[in-house]
């Protein structure tokens, strides 16, 4: 048996034998073409399936912490800033602390409100409701006050000989501090907190104040001026007739913002110096004495500070939906309009059909009258033909012609005639014997000629069988009649 099939397959687990080498080669090729997923390949590297399914996407987001950042990024940043403030509070007294807040309000005796937003920023997004701003009576402890600065991201820096503030990214937040009199020097706070700006994309950016320099006054505010800022994407608070903010118009803050406000209030009360600061997410109010000057970096398109701005009312987005609902709720009215349109179209169609039918009737009447007229003409012509036939038959046996035939036997032979063959045969002119030669008129002569011609034509048919003898008879009366 082994001699019949000497070629053995050397594949593991296969001991088949073949009679020739070609069969063995084909068999080995089958082994090569077979995919092997058995335990022999368990020691190899297994590639993990990373198809981006929704479940895996959500799992990755939870592992990275994206949902936590979306939910509590604002609260997390403020907690971090509050912890840093508490750690540095024990180091030394503070003249003014600036936590990482988008807006800071400082109040003194006489309020002056300054707008720090462009005039064309509408209040349309009700997503982030502003907080009710609280005003705390300041307790100045130190003599030196920091130099007044108003930071407007995206605005022009101060060119006054000192390092400008660093935030230049466009953001709807602004930091405004109090402006002291122009003769004051900036005192470097010994234990001041770092100023952290919270940007719109969820990141924080530290802001370092510049060295102490003498700041000249740029804008002198002689009287209190009030304006309401309009920050893009945040609804502005309502403004009364005097331009001040009405606290009753603010919506109820969220739970996270309430906790943040409580934390900041506790921090302000723990510090025995500086001034009260309350975060207002929608507006920024700067108060100062009327005699004090203030340096303001403001948007170049900002309006004059003497005109208060009132935030426009939010448009109601449910107008189209309400219209659709009213249409859906009134199917009878919709059917009524549909029937009215159908009736109007049917009336127009009837009017067009009437005009078409009337034009056809008018054309038919015209053709009928024309047909009647033509039929009348045909009848008249037929009557005239009948009368002519009767006249011809009546003159066939004229008595004058018969008398001439009896007396003279008139016939003209075509051979002896000087006229060519086929010409009219003899012309017989009749004349009345009783009428005088000069008494015939032209009409009577014409009638006589016509009568003679008709008589000749009738006599030619009756006398063709007779012997051909032609004689021309001219009466003397005819010559006188011809004259």
UniProtKB/Swiss-Prot annotation:
Xref: Gene3D superfamilies: 1.20.5.170, Classic Zinc Finger
Tissue specificity of this protein: Expressed in various tissues including heart, brain, placenta, lung and skeletal muscle. Highest levels in skeletal muscle. Lowest in lung and placenta.
Span list, region Leucine-zipper: 360-388
Protein origin, superkingdom: Eukaryota
Consequence recorded when altering residue 22 to K: No effect on binding adenovirus 2 E1A. Abolishes ATF7-mediated E1A responsiveness
Residues with Phosphothreonine modification: 51, 53, 101
Glycyl lysine isopeptide (Lys-Gly) (interchain with G-Cter in SUMO1) crosslink residues: 107
Annotated segments matching region Transactivation domain: 1-285
InterPro entries in UniProt: bZIP (IPR004827), bZIP_sf (IPR046347), bZIP_transcription_factors (IPR051027), TF_CRE-BP1-typ (IPR016378), Znf_C2H2_sf (IPR036236), Znf_C2H2_type (IPR013087)
Polar residues bias locations: 429-439
Keyword check for Metal-binding: yes
Region (Disordered): 110-148, 299-345, 407-439
Entry GO MF terms: cAMP response element binding; DNA-binding transcription factor activity; DNA-binding transcription factor activity, RNA polymerase II-specific; DNA-binding transcription repressor activity, RNA polymerase II-specific; enzyme binding; mitogen-activated protein kinase binding; RNA polymerase II cis-regulatory region sequence-specific DNA binding; sequence-specific double-stranded DNA binding
Assigned GO CC terms: chromatin; chromosome, telomeric region; cytoplasm; nucleoplasm; nucleus; RNA polymerase II transcription regulator complex
Biological process, per Gene Ontology: negative regulation of transcription by RNA polymerase II; positive regulation of transcription by RNA polymerase II; regulation of DNA-templated transcription; regulation of transcription by RNA polymerase II
Maturation and modification: On EGF stimulation, phosphorylated first on Thr-53 allowing subsequent phosphorylation on Thr-51. This latter phosphorylation prevents sumoylation, increases binding to TAF12 and enhances transcriptional activity. Sumoylation delays nuclear localization and inhibits transactivation activity through preventing binding to TAF12. RANBP2 appears to be the specific E3 ligase.
Zinc finger intervals, C2H2-type: 7-31
Low complexity bias spans: 114-126, 307-320
Compartment list: Nucleus; Nucleus, Nucleoplasm; Chromosome, Telomere
UniProt region (Essential for binding adenovirus 2 E1A), positions on chain: 325-483
SUPFAM superfamilies according to UniProt: beta-beta-alpha zinc fingers (SSF57667), Leucine zipper domain (SSF57959)
Family from the record: Belongs to the bZIP family.
Record text on subunit structure and interactions: Homodimer; binds DNA as homodimer. Heterodimer; heterodimerizes with other members of ATF family and with JUN family members. Interacts with JNK2; the interaction does not phosphorylate ATF7 but acts as a docking site for other ATF-associated partners such as JUN family members. Interacts (via its transactivation domain) with TAF12 (isoforms TAFII15 and TAFII20); the interaction potentiates the transactivation activity (isoform TAFII20 only) and is inhibited by ATF7 sumoylation. Interacts with TAF4; the interaction inhibits the TAF12-dependent transactivation.
Function: Stress-responsive chromatin regulator that plays a role in various biological processes including innate immunological memory, adipocyte differentiation or telomerase regulation. In absence of stress, contributes to the formation of heterochromatin and heterochromatin-like structure by recruiting histone H3K9 tri- and di-methyltransferases thus silencing the transcription of target genes such as STAT1 in adipocytes, or genes involved in innate immunity in macrophages and adipocytes.
Official protein name in the record: Cyclic AMP-dependent transcription factor ATF-7
Organism: Homo sapiens
